[in-house]
Amino acid sequence: MKTVFVNPERCIGCRQCEFACAVAHSRSHDAAIAPFETPRPRSRIHVGTGTTYNTSFPNKCRHCDPAPCVEVCPTSSMHRDRERAVVLADGHKCIACAMCAMVCPFDVITFHSAANGAPPRVVATKCDGCVERVSSGEIPACVEACKAGALVFGDLNELIAAGCARETSAMLTSATAALATREPDGVAGWRAWGASATHVNEEVRHGKP
């Protein structure tokens, strides 16, 4: 199963993924025209503030299985496409009850007027995995726009394995660096005592009491 994998440590907060997503879900699919369409196309990926200073995090639907939004939707607007392994929102069935948004653990479901042919009213909007692009052999718009490598498209198991290998390597590197610079217990105290003793010896040598 292919999916979009997020590397938050590589996100630079440029928000190019947001713009590319909005254009991909516009009527014109043209970056020069899409911003002026009515209703204005909206991004389904959102770059937010990270957990540490000066960091960003691209947040998008994880297409959970089972998906809480699918389980609570009273009209089956939220449904899973088993063939393509994505959770989709059918704007024609959506009644904007917001049950899906309330149970979404990642807070990625928003409500906007549909811009790509769905009913001209506010409906639930979320990432659809760029199913049309992927079906035609392209990669998701957000991944194509990301030049920092924060978004990667590929087989889920392979991406997880690569991510685990990267994290393990980082942990080993950090641990080695920490061990190389760590002093044995008590050394700091001995160094302080030595400095004091040297100071006293210098005073005695120069005839100071």
Predicted regions and their residues:
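Short amphipathic alpha-helical segments
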Residues: 2-4, 57, 85, 123
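Ordered, amphipathic secondary-structure segments that act as subunit-interaction surfaces
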Residues: 63-81, 85-86
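Protein kinase-like catalytic domain
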Residues: 22-25, 74, 105
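N-terminal cysteine/histidine-rich coordination modules
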Residues: 1-51
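Active-site cradle of extracellular carbohydrate-active enzymes
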Residues: 83-95
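Aromatic-flanked redox-active Cys/Sec active sites in thiol-based oxidoreductases
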Residues: 8, 75, 91
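Flanking helices and flexible, charged tails adjoining ferredoxin-like Fe-S electron-transfer domains
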Residues: 29-63, 71, 92-93, 99-209
